[in-house]
Amino acid sequence: YLEDFRPGQVFRHKGGKTLNEGLFNAFTDFSMTTNPLHKNAEYARLHGFKGLVAPPGLVMNVVVSQTVEDISENARANLEYINMRFGAPVYIGDTLEAETTIVGVAPSTKDPDRGVVHVSSVGRNQRGEVVIAFERKVQIWKNDLAAPCEKGELEKKPQIECTPGIPAYDRGRDYKSKSHLANRDTFFEDFNAGDVYEHSRGRLVTEEHIALTGQLDNTSQVHCNQFLIDQNPEKYIGGRLIVYGGIPFNLCLGISCPDIGDNSPADIVYTTGRHVGPIFAGDTV
């Protein structure tokens, strides 16, 4: 709960997660991503990768979900991702572990039953290589309204080196031999500052979001425990199961991929990402 957090606390999250083929396929297919790096092993190897590359949205979801039990299981809402950077590529069979530092705690001046916790998290693979680093802000309930909870912020945030693991260009590789597998108009020279794309695809979110969230080991009860919500429906947004925010975030990446990311060797950074409204089963992104 909010009163349990202090700036400077460090959590080495338990469990870890080995990315198996089932999880890879479930999330890659659900997201509607079209980048051949996530679909075609021969294409990925031609471009210098070891095999199929996990989409950035999947890497994000695996690592964020590992932090939930310690950080946001008692959250009202996940508010914002900040400076989300991607590092070493992630493959099927890689094991990811996560660590989080509490950067700041800010009790609400309007609602005494809640406040915002600001964290910095990092995900590493089995070789200790950083695969993702990000900050996020979470609105969290208080358990005891009378419990002391002071506003505080670290003077210096954790400095995490996160370098994209993009294979070097190799003149000896025949990249053009498989260029037909990606959309033609999504190369670097096709984009201009100020271009606006209205993406033509969408995806209905059904009750399958519960199973997808479970596959990630995300333990937040607002995504899976309707009985809990029914005990006090006014406390919870919409009074029903809310879709884990990483799912619509992942859909936004996938739906935009054929217009923006088909020829991307890697996503580098998301400077910010906000959850400005809830998604429920039956909504279309």
Segments from the language model and where they lie:
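Hydrophobic residues positioned within well-ordered beta-strands of beta-sheet architectures
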Residues: 13, 82, 98, 117-119, ...
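HotDog/MaoC-like acyl-thioester-processing domains
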Residues: 2-7, 88-176, 281-283
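Hot-dog-fold acyl-thioester-processing enzymes
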Residues: 1-81, 143-270
